[in-house]
């Protein structure tokens, strides 16, 4: 069979398997995930051997040290994958939950019940752990999942999927509910994105270029997250100690993640007092500052910011800083340059905090807290499949519930429409 024919078969089989997955009781899904976790641990030497093939190929290709690090599996990372499966097993099962129930004047009882989405396609880059993480979340939510990882991790991904699939067979669960596209060629991705007859949703996880490629070529709905241009606004009433703590944490703790701070906005009334303080602290922490003229007046070490800086996702120790006239300009700036990801205000003014929450058009908005909390675990969702900056079907960090949809359920007693 051609690649196109094989991928169509994988997708069709996943659709059939999704029917069985939707019927699985919670205990069966949890038992499966626990067995999968044990299987990963017991197959650690095999996984490391398969991963070594990817690492050796990556070194020959000249992959960067950072890419090779993301690609690498060792005992600790395999244990972390297994722990992740156990964590998902411990999460509440959203499938079958009745989220609302109301009574109509004709005594009909109407409700909404959570059901699986069906078949979910995950397209991701060279992170073998995503194979286990994404599979666990999709399966727990009663879905089939089709995985297409980066070609750099092909041996690792296939090995992980094979081990997990063996546990599904032992449990009497259709193995087709978990598939990996085995073709490293880009044609495999393109054919996967054509299977709108069988796949309900595509979730790409990776850099902006990957996500734009998927969106451009997909016939299937896509959950998008292009980049994280996250802001903190220090209001005129802000507590400076709190503001400094939040800014440092948001920028410095992990600068290479999507919920790290990229642009700092400061109210003009506190610019003279706060900018020298925060600039000195950040400079000591090796952060390069890029500011407007007002910022550079109080922090001469800052480079002159350009228009591109206001829309940049640096993912490194660089911070754009701007002085604004007040809350209105801060909100306008965020809504103009932000990426609908995560924004925070530091303020003691309740009215300003509520306006910021209502008017900032992003998926996570915080008051007096670091942008680093925009994460499924930190927000109490448990493990997350990703962060969506698409308002349909989900907005913000996506947990198990976001891998389901709802249907109407109606209880009657013989009513007919008049």
UniProtKB/Swiss-Prot annotation:
It is an enzyme of class 1 (oxidoreductase). Pathway: Amino-acid biosynthesis; L-proline biosynthesis; L-glutamate 5-semialdehyde from L-glutamate: step 2/2. Keywords: Amino-acid biosynthesis, Cytoplasm, NADP, Oxidoreductase, Proline biosynthesis. The keyword Transferase does not apply. It catalyses: L-glutamate 5-semialdehyde + phosphate + NADP(+) = L-glutamyl 5-phosphate + NADPH + H(+). GO terms for cellular component: cytoplasm. GO terms for molecular function: glutamate-5-semialdehyde dehydrogenase activity; NADP binding. GO terms for biological process: L-proline biosynthetic process. InterPro entries: Ald_DH/histidinol_DH, Ald_DH_C, Ald_DH_N, Aldehyde_DH_dom, G-glutamylP_reductase_CS, Glu-5-SA_DH, GPR_dom. Signal peptide: none annotated. It is found in: Cytoplasm. Pfam families: Aldedh. The keyword Oxidoreductase applies. CDD domains: ALDH_F18-19_ProA-GPR. Its EC number is 1.2.1.41. Its main location: cytoplasm. HAMAP family: ProA. NCBIfam families: PRK00197.1, proA. Catalyzes the NADPH-dependent reduction of L-glutamate 5-phosphate into L-glutamate 5-semialdehyde and phosphate. The product spontaneously undergoes cyclization to form 1-pyrroline-5-carboxylate. Belongs to the gamma-glutamyl phosphate reductase family. This is Gamma-glutamyl phosphate reductase. It comes from Geobacter metallireducens (strain ATCC 53774 / DSM 7210 / GS-15). The gene is proA.
């Amino acid at each position: 069979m051609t690649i196109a024919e094989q991928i169509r078969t994988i997708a069709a089989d996943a659709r059939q398997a999704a029917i069985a997955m939707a019927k699985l009781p919670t205990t069966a899904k949890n038992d499966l995930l626990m067995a999968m976790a044990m299987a990963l641990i017991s197959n650690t030497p095999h996984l490391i051997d398969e991963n070594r093939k990817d690492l050796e190929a990556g070194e020959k290709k000249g992959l960067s040290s950072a890419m090779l690090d993301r690609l690498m599996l060792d005992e600790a990372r395999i244990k972390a994958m297994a722990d992740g499966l156990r964590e998902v097993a411990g999460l509440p099962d959203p499938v079958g939950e009745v989220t609302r129930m109301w009574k109509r004047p004709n005594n009909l009882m109407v409700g909404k019940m959570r059901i699986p989405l069906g078949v979910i396609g995950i397209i991701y880059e060279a992170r073998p752990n995503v194979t286990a993480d994404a599979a666990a979340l999709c399966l727990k939510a009663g879905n089939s999942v089709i995985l297409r990882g980066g070609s750099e991790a092909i041996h690792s991904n296939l090995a992980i999927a094979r081990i997990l699939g063996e546990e599904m067979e032992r449990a009497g669960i259709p193995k087709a509910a978990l598939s990996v596209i085995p073709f490293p060629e880009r044609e495999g991705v393109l054919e996967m994105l054509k299977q709108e007859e069988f796949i309900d949703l595509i979730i790409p996880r990776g850099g902006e270029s990957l996500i734009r490629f998927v969106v451009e070529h997909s016939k299937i709905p896509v959950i998008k997250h292009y980049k994280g241009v996250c802001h903190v606004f220090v209001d005129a009433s802000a507590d400076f100690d709190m503001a400094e703590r939040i800014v440092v944490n948001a920028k410095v703790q992990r600068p290479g993640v999507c919920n790290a701070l990229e642009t700092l906005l400061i109210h003009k009334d506190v610019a003279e007092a706060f900018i020298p303080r925060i600039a000195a602290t950040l400079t000591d922490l090796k952060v390069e500052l890029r500011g407007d003229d007002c910022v550079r007046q109080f922090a001469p070490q800052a480079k002159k910011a350009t228009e591109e800086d206001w829309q940049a996702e640096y993912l490194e120790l660089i911070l754009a800083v701007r002085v604004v006239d007040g809350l209105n300009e801060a909100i306008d700036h965020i809504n103009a340059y932000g990426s609908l990801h995560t924004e925070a205000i530091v303020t003691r003014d309740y009215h300003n905090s509520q306006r910021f929450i209502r008017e900032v058009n992003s998926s996570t908005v915080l008051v007096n807290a670091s942008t680093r909390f925009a994460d499924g675990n930190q927000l109490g969702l448990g493990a997350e499949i990703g962060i969506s900056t698409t308002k349909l079907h989900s907005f913000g960090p996506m947990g198990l519930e976001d891998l389901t949809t709802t249907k109407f359920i109606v209880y009657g007693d013989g009513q007919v429409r008049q």
